[in-house]
Curated annotation (Swiss-Prot):
Subunit-structure text: Binds to small GTPases racE, racC but not rab21. Binds preferentially to GDP-bound racE.
Keywords: Repeat
The gene coding this protein: darA
The protein, known as: Darlin
ARM repeat positions: 82-119, 167-208, 423-464, 465-537, 610-649
Region listing for Disordered, in residue ranges: 561-585
GO molecular function annotation: guanyl-nucleotide exchange factor activity; small GTPase binding
SUPFAM superfamilies listed in its UniProt record: ARM repeat
InterPro entries in UniProt: ARM-like (IPR011989), ARM-type_fold (IPR016024), RAP1GDS1 (IPR040144)
Length: 766
């Protein structure tokens, strides 16, 4: 012992150590490691070895020494493994009975060395595992023994460092049963705080791997939650490293997909809500700290992180049912939604005058309310919660009142938009004047896109023509709509167009109002002509808020897309041509919807006295109506054709000045035969599949629209033009006769089409 101490003192001299960096030479390390005696059990030898390992552990606190120690020629890792084998000949099973106090102190220093060598050092972890993987078995056994708590603490620390961000070592410790051992240790009565601190760090690192989580179930989670509550009640949350590490572990585990559903079924949300409900007492424990010692960016209670976890769980469509279903005992007090609403609406606690921590406590509460409000907004997407929420509409309307908090406003708009799913609900919400309230808010935050998008979507739901007959938008609301039609975001543009459509459906006089409103017509024409840049990406960092349940009020384009997916079998050549067009063009939904609105204006005779506006409308609608005509959806093609017919009535020269009009119309007529080919093919298929019948019904609907399209183009355009000698000549110059004959001879061309073509051919050849 004295000899070793003397050697250590000598090695501390300048010959072996850099005094500035505390870096020891390879020679010094080698001299010390050679003194390890792994072939004797004498007390003096054990104590000498303990001193050697303690010294090496101290040296390895310096980063530069770790490489020198672990790769020393005498191989300290191999010597250590041999030492374990020699001192524990009967294996780890008899550790509690066979190990002396002196040996436990030695093992403790060995663990300390291994922990220091692998602290933030992945190559050293790999080196140990490659050379002597069995050494992990001994370290694991030191945790499971109950006789020496100091050894438990240092072995836990070693496991924490060895397993940090190292999958293969995490998995090896898991196979040795360490995950379960650590849970038992953490939850055992009588485990000291010092051991617990290290045990939770080891556990935290081990379960950072889904493969090591497979044996953890709700029972284990519940036990850990119990320990967390004990720790919080004793020490609070701030600067409670055990609680912080345990929260980190529970957060990691609660995001395990296989574990999530199990723990939610067993009532995990109830435990989380309880943590929030009990957090006021933990906030008060911050009073034991001096103001200057408190880091302002740290949470002072567990409630903010808990509420954030609750929000993440609610963000999963499959898990929201656990928020509105009563807990297993059926007790109303355990209804998660009711308790969340109570948290959201509760006034902030009153703090004593002169409480210097009052602001910190209030901010902590505010974080919780923000997360819970976001969670409630997500829950409003579910049909099953609407009847509950609509009973207390004012608490949701109040989210929009007297606030500068943009996130609070977005949540309020989202909830109100989702509540507006039925006529009674809309009437009740409108009794609070929410349309104007939202319109004013949108004007107040013009550049905050989530507020604009969800505001437009909410008002769209509240102004459905079936609910709000006779509705007339205010000047503020019109300004909001016009402003958003210019925003470079397709989602917002489409929402603005949906509102214009609603206004017209509510009252035809709104056509005149829109026409007269400054810049309104121009903004609509710009959208229809594709002059406004658009992106599908929301530029805001609050993308998760753009989740209004638009599926409840389906736009016609969604239906078209579904049909398009269902009807995939088409003529090969036509398919190739259509696909080429689709790939070369941008997303056309906004252009289509804006053009459909232009048709409403052209088709209204009461607007004829607005000559300047109508002239502008006619001149700038030619290309949009051709775009609509060339869309992939028969119903839109019909509207495009009708729009062109109206344009021809106002100014046929605008139409005729388009060089390719004959070719464009014939091409659309050619494509209009496809639904008839599809119908013939599907009707010949014998099947009892009910989905096949739906498919046939969809194709039949397309056939009806195609028939109408053929009639509009052939009767109202081609035939009428064939009666005009000057136009007839231009048509012939564009090879119209040959084109129509080819079209007439197509297979599966319906009789109505061939009859109309024949009528036109007769007129053209007179």
């Amino acid at each position: 012992m004295e000899e070793i101490q003397k050697l250590i003192n000598e090695l501390g001299g300048s010959q072996y150590k850099d005094k500035d960096t505390e870096h020891y030479s390879e020679e010094a390390v080698e001299l010390l490691i050679k003194k390890i005696d792994n072939k004797s059990k004498g007390k003096t030898v054990i104590e000498s070895n303990t001193l050697i390992y303690k010294t090496l552990a101290d040296w390895s606190k310096v980063e530069d020494n770790r490489e020198t120690i672990i790769r020393s020629p005498s191989n300290v890792i191999e010597k250590t493994f041999q030492l374990f084998e020699f001192l524990l000949p009967n294996g780890v099973e008899t550790l509690n009975t066979d190990t002396t106090v002196e040996q436990s102190e030695l093992f403790s220093m060995v663990c300390r060395l291994l922990g220091n060598l692998t602290y933030e050092n992945a190559p050293n972890r790999e080196f140990i595992f490659d050379k002597t993987p069995s050494i992990l078995k001994y370290i694991s056994s030191f945790v499971s023994q109950t006789k020496y708590q100091s050894l438990q603490r240092t072995s836990c620390a070693a496991i924490a460092n060895l397993s940090s961000e190292t999958d293969f070592i995490q998995l090896e410790f898991f196979k040795l049963g360490v995950v379960s051992i650590l849970i038992d240790l953490i939850c055992r009565e009588g485990t000291t705080d010092e051991v617990n601190q290290m045990a939770i760090k080891a556990f935290n690192n081990l379960v950072d791997n889904e493969n090591t989580q497979v044996d953890i179930h709700f029972k284990e989670i519940h036990r850990l939650l119990g320990q967390l509550k004990k720790s919080l009640n004793k020490e609070g949350y701030y600067e409670n490293s055990f609680a912080n590490d345990l929260v980190s572990s529970l957060s990691t585990l609660s995001l395990n997909k296989d574990l999530q559903k199990e723990i939610l079924k067993e009532g995990f949300l109830n435990d989380l809500i309880e943590l929030i409900e009990e957090s006021n007492v933990h906030r008060e424990m911050i009073n034991q700290f001096e103001d200057d010692d408190i880091e302002k960016d740290k949470d002072i209670s567990i409630a903010p992180s808990t509420s954030e976890l609750i929000f993440k769980l609610a963000d999963n469509d499959d898990y929201r049912q656990y928020f509105y279903n009563k807990e297993r005992d059926g007790n109303d007090a355990n209804n998660i939604l009711d308790r969340m609403i109570k948290i959201m609406t509760s006034p902030p606690p009153a703090y004593k005058d002169g409480d210097s921590k009052a602001q910190l406590k209030a901010l902590d509460v505010a974080k919780v309310k923000k997360n819970i409000t976001k969670t409630i907004a997500l829950c409003s997407l579910e049909d099953d919660v609407i009847d509950k929420f609509i009973k207390t509409p004012k608490i949701f309307v109040d989210l929009l009142v007297d606030t500068e908090d943009t996130e609070r406003i977005v949540n309020g708009e989202m909830i109100i938009g989702n509540l507006a799913r039925s006529e009674p609900n809309c009437r009740l919400l409108n009794s609070y004047n929410v349309i104007e309230l939202i319109a004013d808010i949108m004007k107040k935050f013009p550049n905050f896109q989530p507020i604009q998008h969800l505001g437009l979507s909410s008002i769209r739901n509240l102004t459905l023509p079936t609910i709000n007959k006779g509705f007339k938008p205010s000047s503020t609301l019109m300004e909001d709509v016009v402003f958003n039609s210019k925003v470079h975001n397709q989602v917002i543009q489409f929402a603005a167009l949906s509102l214009i459509k609603n206004f017209i459906g509510c009252d035809q006089s709104n056509l005149k109002l829109f026409l007269e409103f400054p810049n309104a017509l121009q903004s609509l024409l710009d959208l229809a002509n594709g002059r406004v840049p658009a992106s599908m990406d929301d530029e805001s960092d609050q993308q998760e808020q753009l989740q209004l349940d638009d599926a409840k009020i389906q736009e016609i384009e969604e239906k078209f897309e579904e049909k398009e997916k269902t009807i995939e079998k088409t003529d090969e050549k036509t398919d190739e041509k259509t696909n080429e067009k689709k790939q070369s063009k941008k997303d056309m939904r906004v252009i289509y919807e804006a053009t459909r609105l232009l048709l409403r204006f052209l088709d209204n005779s009461e607007l004829s006295n607005h000559q300047e506006k109508m002239k502008q409308l006619i001149e700038e609608s030619v290309e949009p109506f051709f775009s609509l005509l060339q869309s992939p959806f028969p119903i839109l093609q019909v509207e495009g054709a009708k729009g062109l017919v109206l344009l021809i009535k106002h100014d046929k020269q605008l139409f005729l000045s388009r060089p390719s009009w004959v070719k464009d119309l014939v091409e659309v007529l050619s494509l209009s035969i496809i639904p008839f080919q599809q119908l013939s093919r599907e009707q010949s298929t014998i099947t009892t599949d009910p989905n096949h019948q739906k498919l046939i019904a969809q194709i039949q609907s397309n056939c009806n629209f195609s028939t109408e399209l053929q009639n509009v183009i052939l009767s109202n355009i081609f035939y009428n033009f064939s009666l005009d000698e000057s136009i007839c000549k231009k048509m012939k110059d564009q090879n119209v006769i040959s084109e129509l004959k080819t079209l007439k001879s197509k297979q599966d061309a319906p009789q109505s089409l061939t009859n109309l073509i024949q009528k036109i051919l007769v007129q053209l050849t007179i």
